[in-house]
């Protein structure tokens, strides 16, 4: 320790004259204290010195070092002291005698006593005795001092939080409390440093001591302490882990008890709480809620011997979200009584009608009967079958829990306008067209709205005047005596009113007919349109017929050869024939022969192209025919599914193709698939497109009508389920009236109002208007086809009863 730290009383900045005065005062006080034998206490800051001479030499050397270090520090910092800062009174030119004396000389006669001596006297043990005569040791009170805590110990190096790396390029490590430099210890040669890094000394930590700058190593005591902590041993050597056990409480027999509290009365009185519990069990036994095991066995044996036939055998099932109770059978009605009222008994006609129906279509599976007495009722023959069906329903039919919703039924009904405000629409039958001997499959009306064409299973095509119902033209295209398998599947007028061409699909042939009912100009224009294409048909190929005959033997094979030319594909799918003389007299101008039966035909809006559908023709199911060039081509190399219907877009070069479960929209100009609609039905029957081209109607054989908005998703916008049987036909009004109608095998026609708004944010408005009935159901077939008048709100229908009807306002 330095001189300043040992003394602890003088400041570096105090003048020397003041120090000398204090020294003289202390010498006087020391002599007075020595005479009175009073002791001067110092806090153990001065250590014992060997001799006064050695102390003076050491003091002189330290003064020299202090002067040298102060001089060097002033030179580095460039500090200059102003002489005016010092007081002139504290300085004198004459030397003083007391300057040569050291502080140790001044306090040499003082007797120093450390705190350890005081504590050893204060902290003494007193020995007394207990009341029983045993020895009692009273130890001194523990004072909470910081003997072992070094958290507030001051560091020798006073650089604070500055890292030692800041002094790497300097010869010193920092400064002590007096501002002196702490010089860096001398380092050995490079070889010594290498050897030290290879042979690490014991206790090496790799750290540097902040106070000295040398390596910080652990002592043997610290290493031993670390070893004990790692091995979970006691770090204090004074603790004996195997000290002998002293029975402090059981070694001596106690004469008096620890507590002499007398026992309470409740220890000797029966418990009231236990009495309540016992009485609760006794009441349960008396009431039968608790049964002894012996009686339980007796009851089980008695129940086994005395079986109750009419007892409820339902096993109690805990209420759980996964436990769904089986629905109970409905109670018997008056019809099932052995003596029902007369109004429940069936007549002979009703019995025959009930017996003629299929068992699945019957409303009830029994006939009501009347007996005079209960003893006359015979055994029920259907009991075994009903029990068997009940068992099948219990373990095969899925169970669903329907949560009841507290919703006002009137709030679910949309607010629709009144049908009276949406007139005109057809409400009654005004004309019936009779003449066909078999069911009428298809009807069509000419663009002018004057002539109605009908095609029937009797093989004839008839044209009627719509206002009077008079038949003006009749042509027999199929001889039923020779060919009774083919039918008139479809027919449609050419949209061009100046041609008067009627396309009729009969079996595998397509007949282009110009009926002689329009006048010379229109009939001549129609024939010229058809005959102008014969020059384009051959392409100069004389062996056309031979190629077609060779291909007829392979018509069941798939024509998927990608190397075939476009002309060969067009010529292979269909063949155009001119009519013979007899067919010309009937008004037939051209015949197109396909490979399979043609089911549907639809014209393009310009009247030059028409598309046909042959569901059994595989990849050539859809054919596009050109009237002006007598060309037939298949737009698809493969048909995905069985094709049911196909139609052109009203004004875009797009083709709508309906299979059994999907509707695909193709762009004919770019030859790509535009969109695929998913109606979500099992079997589509027909489709129709709104005149604006942004909505589509589809009907299905599973009693559904689907409205698709092409601007929305691929799923239906609305699904209408109001028909009881398969829906055969559905049609939009092609004029300016927002109407559409659907026909079904239930013999009903439903008229709807369907407004499509120009605003894309507004959904179409669908309002049911009228239900028309009049056609008879023959062999479970009702109405087969519908067509709207091109200008008026009139509807034409074709039924299986062999009649066509006009429904007007």
UniProtKB/Swiss-Prot annotation:
GO BP terms in the entry: maturation of 5.8S rRNA from tricistronic rRNA transcript (SSU-rRNA, 5.8S rRNA, LSU-rRNA); maturation of LSU-rRNA from tricistronic rRNA transcript (SSU-rRNA, 5.8S rRNA, LSU-rRNA)
Disulfide bond residue pairs: none
Ranges: WD repeats: 435-474, 483-523, 593-635, 638-676, 679-718, 722-762, 778-809
Region (Required for interaction with NOP7): 267-383
GO molecular function, one term: ribonucleoprotein complex binding
Keyword RNA-binding tagged: no
Region named Required for interaction with YTM1: 383-419
Biased composition (Acidic residues): 30-70, 77-97, 553-563
Predominant location category: nucleus
Record's keyword terms, sorted: Nucleus, Repeat, Ribosome biogenesis, rRNA processing, WD repeat
Residue intervals passing through the bilayer: none
Superkingdom, natural source: Eukaryota
Self-association state and partner proteins as the record states: Component of the NOP7 complex, composed of ERB1, NOP7 and YTM1. The complex is held together by ERB1, which interacts with NOP7 via its N-terminal domain and with YTM1 via a high-affinity interaction between the seven-bladed beta-propeller domains of the 2 proteins. The NOP7 complex associates with the 66S pre-ribosome.
Family the entry assigns: Belongs to the WD repeat BOP1/ERB1 family.
Protein name (record): Ribosome biogenesis protein ERB1
């Amino acid at each position: 320790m330095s001189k300043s730290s040992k003394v602890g009383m003088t400041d570096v900045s105090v003048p020397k004259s003041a120090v000398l005065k204090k020294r003289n005062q202390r010498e006087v006080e020391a002599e007075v204290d020595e005479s009175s034998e009073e002791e001067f206490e110092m806090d153990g800051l001065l250590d014992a010195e060997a001799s006064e001479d050695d102390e003076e030499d050491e003091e002189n050397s330290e003064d020299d070092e202090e002067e040298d270090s102060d001089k060097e520090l002033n030179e580095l910092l460039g500090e200059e002291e102003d002489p005016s800062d010092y007081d002139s009174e504290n300085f004198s030119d004459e030397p003083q005698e007391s300057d040569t004396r050291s502080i140790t000389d001044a306090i040499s006669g003082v007797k120093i006593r450390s705190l350890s001596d005081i504590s050893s006297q204060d902290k003494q043990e007193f020995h007394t005795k207990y009341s029983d005569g045993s020895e009692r040791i009273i130890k001194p009170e523990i004072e909470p001092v910081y003997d072992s805590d070094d958290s507030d110990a001051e560091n020798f190096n006073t650089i604070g939080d500055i890292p030692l790396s800041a002094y790497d390029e300097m010869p010193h490590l920092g400064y002590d409390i007096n501002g002196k430099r702490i010089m860096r210890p001398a380092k050995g040669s490079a070889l010594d440093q290498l050897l030290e890094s290879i042979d690490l000394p014991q206790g090496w930590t790799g750290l540097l001591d902040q106070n000295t700058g040398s390596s910080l190593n652990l002592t043997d005591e610290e290493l031993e302490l670390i070893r004990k902590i790692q091995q979970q041993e006691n770090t204090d050597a004074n603790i004996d882990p195997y000290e002998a056990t002293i029975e402090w409480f059981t070694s001596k027999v106690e004469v008096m008890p620890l507590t002499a509290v007398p026992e309470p009365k409740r220890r000797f009185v029966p418990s009231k709480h236990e009495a309540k519990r016992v009485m609760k069990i006794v009441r349960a036994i008396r009431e039968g809620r608790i049964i002894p095991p012996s009686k339980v066995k007796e009851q089980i044996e008695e129940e086994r011997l005395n079986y109750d036939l009419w007892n409820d055998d339902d096993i109690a099932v805990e209420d759980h979200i996964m436990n769904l109770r089986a629905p109970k059978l409905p109670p018997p009605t008056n019809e099932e009584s052995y003596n029902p009222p007369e109004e429940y008994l069936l007549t002979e006609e009703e019995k025959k009608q009930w017996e003629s129906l299929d068992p699945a279509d019957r409303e009830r599976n029994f006939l009501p009967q009347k007996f005079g007495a209960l003893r006359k009722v015979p055994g029920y023959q259907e009991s075994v079958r009903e029990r068997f069906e009940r068992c099948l329903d219990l373990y095969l039919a899925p169970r669903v829990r329907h949560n009841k919703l507290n919703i006002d039924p009137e709030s679910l009904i949309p607010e629709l306008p009144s049908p009276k405000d949406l007139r005109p629409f057809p409400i009654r039958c005004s004309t019936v067209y009779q003449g066909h001997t078999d069911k009428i499959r298809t009807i069509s009306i000419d663009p002018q709205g004057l002539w109605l064409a009908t095609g029937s299973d009797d093989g004839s095509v008839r044209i009627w005047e719509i206002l009077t119902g008079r038949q003006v033209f009749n042509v027999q295209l199929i001889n039923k005596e020779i060919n009774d398998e083919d039918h008139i599947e479809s027919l449609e007028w050419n949209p061009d009113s100046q041609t008067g061409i009627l396309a009729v699909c009969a079996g595998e042939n397509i007949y282009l007919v110009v009926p002689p009912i329009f006048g010379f100009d229109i009939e001549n224009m129609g024939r010229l349109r058809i005959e102008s294409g014969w020059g384009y048909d051959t392409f100069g190929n004389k062996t056309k017929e031979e190629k077609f005959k060779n291909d007829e033997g392979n018509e069941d094979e798939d024509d998927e050869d990608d190397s075939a030319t476009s002309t060969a594909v067009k010529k292979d799918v269909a063949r155009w024939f001119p009519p013979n003389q007899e067919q010309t007299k009937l008004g037939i101008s051209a015949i197109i022969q396909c490979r399979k039966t043609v089911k549907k035909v639809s014209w393009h809006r310009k009247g030059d192209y028409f598309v046909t559908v042959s569901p059994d023709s595989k990849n050539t199911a859809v054919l596009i025919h050109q009237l002006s060039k007598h060309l037939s081509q298949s737009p698809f190399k493969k048909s995905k599914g069985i094709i049911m219907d196909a139609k052109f877009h009203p004004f875009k070069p797009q083709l709508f193709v309906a299979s059994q479960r999907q509707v695909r929209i193709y762009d004919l100009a770019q030859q790509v698939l535009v969109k695929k609609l998913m109606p979500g039905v099992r079997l589509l029957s027909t489709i129709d497109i709104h005149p604006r081209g942004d909505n589509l109607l589809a009907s299905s054989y599973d009693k559904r009508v689907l409205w698709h908005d092409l601007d929305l998703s691929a799923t239906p916008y609305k699904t209408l389920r109001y028909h009881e049987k398969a829906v055969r036909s559905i049609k939009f009004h092609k004029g300016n009236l927002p109407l559409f109608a659907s026909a079904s095998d239930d013999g009903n026609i439903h008229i709807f109002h369907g407004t499509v708004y120009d605003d894309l944010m507004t959904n179409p408005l669908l309002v049911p208007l009228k239900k028309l009935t009049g056609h008879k159901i023959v062999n479970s077939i009702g109405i087969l086809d519908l067509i709207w008048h091109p200008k008026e709100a009139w509807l034409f229908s074709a039924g299986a009863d062999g009649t066509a009807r006009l429904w007007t306002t």
